[in-house]
């Protein structure tokens, strides 16, 4: 547990900017270290085991396959709910100095976009359409537009345009 705490503290020291100044990112994460250490770290390994996504060290954003597994995992849902509620700022954590080959990860964006990503992967979010039951006719008559020409309107000649 001590090594994971050390990793989080080192990551906080390696915050990079995404829309905020480096100082704003540093200040925002410094205040959240204790909450992240005690609340998120116990869920990181179980979520990684469930999904195959490596958050520490990060190797990129989750793939669609990893998101499918994360969206189905109680551990990952709990982790992302905790992250969403932690009050983090929109900044990236850069683990590169600790874990060569890792990439910066914006934990805030990962948390905030999690539910929408799960919906898009599961096909949710679309509004179902309802059709009238088969064998029935609509109760409201429909009127087709008139065919032919409209009185008082003379159609203008058209000239074919050359193909591009």
From Swiss-Prot:
Residues 1-22 form the signal peptide. Its main location: secreted. GO terms for biological process: symbiont-mediated perturbation of host programmed cell death. The keyword Transmembrane helix does not apply. Residues 121-164 are annotated as: Disordered. It comes from the Eukaryota. Keywords: Disulfide bond, Hypersensitive response elicitation, Secreted, Signal. Residues 127-156 have a biased composition (Low complexity). InterPro entries: Elicitin (IPR002200), Elicitin_sf (IPR036470). Disulfide bonds join 25-91, 47-76, 71-118. One of its GO terms (cellular component) is extracellular region. It is found in: Secreted. Induces local and distal defense responses (incompatible hypersensitive reaction) in plants from the solanaceae and cruciferae families. Elicits leaf necrosis and causes the accumulation of pathogenesis-related proteins. Might interact with the lipidic molecules of the plasma membrane. Belongs to the elicitin family. This is Elicitin-like protein 2. The gene is POD-2.
